[in-house]
C-alpha cells in the first residue's frame, strides 16, 4: 500500500510538472496575425506551420486571407494583421495611407502577372508591334476601346498598364472593369470583356481554359516583386519579433531554393487549403516561375550604403508608373520616391535572433 501511494504521488508530481511545462510553452508561443493571398508567397507560412517552425520561433501564425492587395491594406487600421505578404503596388498605398514598412522580398512575380485573351481574339493577330517588346501581342487598333477585366491598383494592374504603354496606349484608351481575380475568371468565361488580367495561380486557370497570354510584366519591360509588409507601430515596438518572423520566412525560402519542384506535392496541398485546385505538374510550374531570394541576397538588394538600393529602384519604377497614370498624386509620388518606407533594419537583425 505504501509503495502504491508512492507511485500515485510520483505520477501526480509528473503530471504537475508536465502541466507546468505546457503552461510555460503556451506562454512562450504568441499568436501572430499575418496577411496573405492565395498565391505562391503564402506557401512559406503555410509550410512553416506544417513543420512547426512558427512554434519553434515562439509564434502561432494566424493566417488571414484576402482576395487582393488593397483589401489587405484596408484591413491594416483595424490591426487585423501586423506582418505578411502583398504586392509591390499595394505596398505603396500601405506606406502612404498606413505608414507601413517594406521589410523583405517574398518573390519575383514578373512573369506570373499577365494579360490574357481568348484564342480567337484579334489582339493575337499582331505580335511585336513595338520592336522594344517583340513578345507582346496587340496593336493600338486591336486594343483601343476594348473592355479589360482587372483588379485595379494591383500588380496585375501594372501588367495591364505596361502592356497598354507598349502599344502606345494608356488606361484611358480602354474600359476597365474592376473585380477580384476569381470574379475576373468567372466573368471572362461568361463572355464578358475582351481581355482579362490575372496573376498566379488564377492565371493558370485561364491558361487551362485555353486563354492566351498577350503580355506579362517581364515581356512588357517591367519588374514586380511580392514584398513582405509590416505595420510600422508593431515593427518599431517589436523588432526582435519581426526578425524572428523573417527568420522563419527565410527558412521557407531556403527550402524552396534547395528542394524546388520536389515540394510540388506539398504545394498542391497548400493550394487546396487555399481553395484552389492545381495538379502537381501545375504546382511545379508555379514553383519554377517564382524566383526567391535568400537572406544574404536580400541584404545586398536592400543595401543603400553606396546609393539607391535595388529594392528602392524596383519600387521607384512602380511609383513613377502609377504617378504618370494619375493613380498617385504628384506629391504622393514625390514622397514615395524617397523610399522612406523601405528598411533593412529587420533583415539585419535576423542573424542575431534565436
Residue map of PLM features:
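Bacterial N-terminal signal peptides that target proteins for export
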Residues: 1-11
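Solvent-exposed, polar/charged alpha-helical surfaces in well-ordered, non-transmembrane soluble domains
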Residues: 51-52, 74, 78, 92, ...
Amino acid at each position: 500500500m505504501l509503495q502504491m501511494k508512492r507511485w500515485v504521488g510520483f505520477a501526480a508530481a509528473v503530471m504537475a510538472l508536465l502541466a507546468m511545462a505546457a503552461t510555460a510553452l503556451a506562454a512562450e508561443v504568441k499568436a501572430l496575425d499575418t496577411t496573405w493571398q492565395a498565391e505562391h508567397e503564402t506557401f512559406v507560412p503555410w509550410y512553416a506551420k506544417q513543420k512547426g517552425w512558427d512554434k519553434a520561433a515562439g509564434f502561432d501564425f494566424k493566417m488571414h486571407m484576402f482576395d487582393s492587395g488593397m483589401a489587405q491594406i484596408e484591413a491594416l487600421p483595424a490591426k487585423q494583421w501586423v506582418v505578411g505578404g502583398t504586392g509591390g503596388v499595394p505596398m505603396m498605398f500601405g506606406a502612404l495611407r498606413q505608414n507601413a514598412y517594406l521589410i523583405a522580398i517574398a518573390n519575383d512575380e514578373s512573369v506570373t502577372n499577365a494579360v490574357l485573351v481568348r484564342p480567337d481574339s484579334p489582339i493575337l493577330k499582331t505580335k511585336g508591334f513595338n520592336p522594344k517588346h517583340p513578345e507582346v501581342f496587340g496593336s493600338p487598333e486591336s486594343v483601343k476601346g476594348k473592355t479589360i477585366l482587372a483588379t485595379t491598383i494591383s500588380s496585375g494592374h501594372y501588367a495591364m498598364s505596361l502592356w497598354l504603354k507598349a502599344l502606345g496606349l494608356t488606361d484611358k484608351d480602354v474600359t476597365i472593369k474592376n473585380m477580384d481575380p476569381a470574379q475576373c475568371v468567372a466573368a471572362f468565361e461568361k463572355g464578358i470583356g475582351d481581355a482579362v488580367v490575372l496573376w498566379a495561380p488564377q492565371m493558370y486557370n485561364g491558361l487551362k481554359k485555353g486563354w492566351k497570354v498577350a503580355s506579362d510584366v517581364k515581356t512588357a519591360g517591367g519588374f514586380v516583386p511580392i514584398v513582405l509588409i509590416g505595420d510600422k507601430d508593431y515593427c518599431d515596438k517589436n523588432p526582435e519579433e519581426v526578425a524572428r518572423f523573417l527568420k522563419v520566412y527565410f527558412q521557407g525560402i531556403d527550402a524552396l531554393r534547395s528542394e524546388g519542384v520536389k515540394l510540388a506535392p506539398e504545394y498542391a496541398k497548400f493550394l487546396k487549403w487555399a481553395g484552389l485546385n492545381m495538379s502537381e505538374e501545375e504546382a511545379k510550374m508555379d514553383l519554377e516561375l517564382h524566383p526567391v531570394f535568400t537572406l544574404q541576397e536580400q541584404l545586398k538588394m536592400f543595401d543603400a550604403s553606396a546609393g539607391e538600393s535595388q529594392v528602392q529602384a524596383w519600387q521607384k519604377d512602380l511609383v513613377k508608373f502609377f504617378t504618370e497614370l494619375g493613380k498617385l498624386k504628384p506629391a504622393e509620388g514625390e514622397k514615395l520616391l524617397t523610399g522612406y518606407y523601405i528598411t533593412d533594419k529587420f533583415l539585419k537583425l535576423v542573424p542575431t535572433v534565436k
